[in-house]
């Protein structure tokens, strides 16, 4: 649970009954896991689990800002424990450990625990200058109580190092050892770190002052089962193409955001790029700039599911199941080898044939792309510079905005993204319609899945495929400054 921290060396400790002893810095997170578990009111249990047996573990703590207390912990089956009493709600307990590894004693970094918050933490983040509150609204209308609505927040608060959020808003580095720590999750005989909390534990949390690649999973009736790599450098999200994935029978959805106080403006969005689990809304507010915008879906889940089934073509109906509607790019049906792998291929062929005999010209945002297809490639210029080449895409390339549409130079990728949007929206053969939203999804073939979510999204906005932000059609919300929002409110529907 600790991650790869820089650890200070404490050389002289007054250990209980041991006089003084030299201590060296602790090793990496692979050495141990630790935490604090709330018990009765005013009481908490500090625990420490070394990866190799220890002859002794001492805990040192500063309760309520008072004097240091030092205790030899009790070994309970390999997990060392110490109960602390007399903690007032909201008070902070600072603690650290000294432990044996068959040689010099090792000392851990200092951690903090807020009484009444659930567990202790070794990570950064939480409230402070540049932070803002993230509030969760349970709009499931009694279908799921707050104790059944789970939140899992993951992101990089330190570049290159993934962390997860605890109920008090502090961030802790992910660790594969959490899979064997007290309170870990188990499903189908496999253990997972418990990185989720419920709305009954925290209905609002402070955002880290910086987070890259932030993802807020919301799951109903179950926490998320997320494995962590053995080197603690990555984690595994739900695999929608794997029926054996532990989250395949879990109702979940998510919100994405990135924010670095003073450097990178807040940008976040609800998304259906990979799937729809249940309706979510996001309200982003910033009083200083007057920004106040809400995006997402306000229909009930039953309405979304029934309207989807009635609206899309036959090829897209099998994407719907009890737990979710899977996006074409995340379904084996629409990928190579699937029954719908060629769903858009005739349209792609016709478009490439059209631009063999007709000049391709796209002018947007002060830039002009001009070219013609020869063989399987579109050779083009941008504002007269070039030439550049865009290979003919496949249907799986289009639904995933990948392959030929995401290859080559930046300029080639730029036009590839434009073609991806045009193919999905059904306007590829008329560049005059590429930036005309009223023309989107009005002809076939097209991406029925993406088109449907644009019909039900607030202001017709949705993130239905990876480049759905082209021509500002997505649900993304971006501030025009790098100051913190006043608030982010996520509505959880059903």
Residue ranges of predicted features:
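Short, flexible coil/linker segments at or flanking structured domains
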Residues: 3-9, 36, 47, 81, ...
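Glycan-association/targeting regions that enable binding to alpha-glucans and other polysaccharides
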Residues: 24-126
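Extracellular low-complexity, O-glycosylation-prone Ser/Thr/Pro/Gly-rich "stalks"
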Residues: 70, 93-111, 116-494
């Amino acid at each position: 649970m600790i991650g790869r921290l820089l650890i200070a060396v404490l050389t002289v400790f007054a250990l209980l009954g041991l006089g003084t002893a030299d201590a060296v810095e602790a090793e990496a997170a692979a050495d141990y896991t630790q935490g604090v578990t709330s018990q009765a009111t005013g009481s908490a249990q500090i625990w420490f689990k070394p990866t190799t047996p220890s002859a002794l573990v001492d805990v040192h703590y500063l309760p309520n800002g008072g004097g240091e207390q030092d205790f030899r912990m009790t070994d309970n089956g390999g997990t060392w424990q110490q109960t602390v009493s007399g903690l007032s709600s909201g008070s902070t307990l600072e603690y650290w450990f000294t432990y044996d590894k068959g040689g010099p004693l090792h000392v851990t970094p200092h951690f903090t625990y807020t009484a009444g918050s659930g567990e202790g933490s070794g990570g950064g983040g939480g409230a402070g200058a540049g932070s803002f509150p993230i509030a969760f609204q349970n709009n499931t209308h009694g279908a799921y109580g707050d104790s059944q609505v789970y939140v899992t927040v993951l992101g990089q608060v330190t570049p290159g190092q993934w962390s997860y959020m605890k109920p008090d808003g502090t961030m802790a580095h992910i660790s594969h050892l959490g899979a064997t720590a007290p309170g870990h999750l188990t499903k189908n005989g496999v253990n997972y770190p418990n990185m989720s909390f419920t709305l009954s534990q925290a209905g609002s949390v402070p955002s880290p002052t910086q987070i890259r690649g932030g993802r807020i999973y919301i799951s109903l009736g179950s926490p998320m089962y997320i494995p962590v790599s053995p080197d603690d450098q990555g984690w595994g999200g739900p695999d929608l193409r794997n029926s054996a994935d532990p989250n395949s029978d879990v109702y979940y959805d998510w919100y994405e955001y990135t924010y670095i106080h003073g450097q990178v403006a807040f940008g976040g969005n609800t998304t259906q790029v990979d799937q729809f689990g249940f309706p979510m809304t996001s309200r982003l507010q910033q009083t200083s700039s007057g920004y106040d915008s809400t995006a997402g879906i306000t229909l009930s889940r039953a309405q979304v599911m029934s309207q989807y089934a009635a609206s899309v073509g036959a090829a897209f109906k099998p994407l719907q199941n009890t737990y979710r509607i899977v996006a074409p790019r995340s379904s084996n049906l629409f990928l190579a080898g699937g029954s719908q792998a060629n769903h858009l291929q005739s349209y792609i062929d016709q478009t490439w044939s059209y631009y063999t005999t007709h000049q391709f010209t796209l002018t947007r945002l002060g830039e002009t792309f001009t070219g013609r297809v020869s063989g399987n490639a579109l050779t083009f210029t941008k504002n007269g510079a070039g030439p550049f080449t865009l290979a003919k895409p496949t249907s799986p390339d289009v639904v995933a905005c990948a392959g030929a549409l995401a290859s080559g130079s930046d300029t080639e990728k730029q036009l590839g993204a434009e073609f991806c949007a045009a193919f999905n929206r059904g306007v590829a053969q008329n560049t005059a319609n590429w930036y005309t939203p009223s023309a989107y999804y009005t002809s076939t073939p097209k991406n029925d899945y993406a088109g449907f979510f644009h019909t039900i999204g607030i202001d017709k906005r949705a993130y239905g495929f990876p480049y759905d932000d082209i021509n500002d059609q997505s649900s993304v919300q971006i501030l025009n400054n790098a100051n913190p929002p006043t608030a982010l409110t996520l509505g959880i529907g059903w």
